[in-house]
Amino acid sequence: REIFEYGNKRKAEIGAENVFDFSIGNPSVPAPKSVNDAIIDLVNNFDSVALHGYTSAQGDAHVRQSVSDYINGRFGTKLTANHIYMTCGAASSLTIVLNAIMLPGEECIAFTPYFPEYGVFIERTGAKLVAVQSENKTFQIDMEKFEAAINEKTKAVIINSPNNPSGVVYTKETIEKMCDLLRKKEKEYGHSIFVITD
């Protein structure tokens, strides 16, 4: 957040058009008209009590069902709405999942560059962030460095694609190699290594 505040200061000093904010993923372009229209439609035509009220802890049942239907259609899985847990933003999702799976002394890998708050989320569990440098020119995962970073304490890997802040999208080949390597390491160490997608 310090970088975000520094960016705001520089915008005031030299103009917003001269500062490129890669800190916390705030948009730099207006929302598409279709998004604005959908919001206006909700405000004008949806039950205002329901719109501004709380949902169940897991999130709105209809939204969770829509998400599970989409995932099932795309990937051939058999998820139900009960497999889906909705949150307001990645920070709460990451905090929940990391607190659920990480134990003190374990390690979680992230690929550089990464969202700086990953370190805070991981370290609050008593675990350690292990930063693995990405390939210099492409920002894809450097598989040799990745393999060297995995050990018996590795419990999770956070991937972010499109990446914040680089914007890189991991290729299918990169993801497949990563998964193959993790399956190999799970067998070697005898425990699961979770992939967390942000």
Show which residues each predicted segment covers.
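Short beta->alpha connector loops at strand-helix junctions that form conserved
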Residues: 112, 131-136
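N-terminal small-domain helix-loop-helix segment of the aminotransferase-like
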Residues: 1-89, 96
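A short helix-loop-beta submotif of the ANL/AMP-binding
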Residues: 123-130
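Active-site phosphate-binding strand-loop segment of PLP-dependent enzymes
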Residues: 135-198
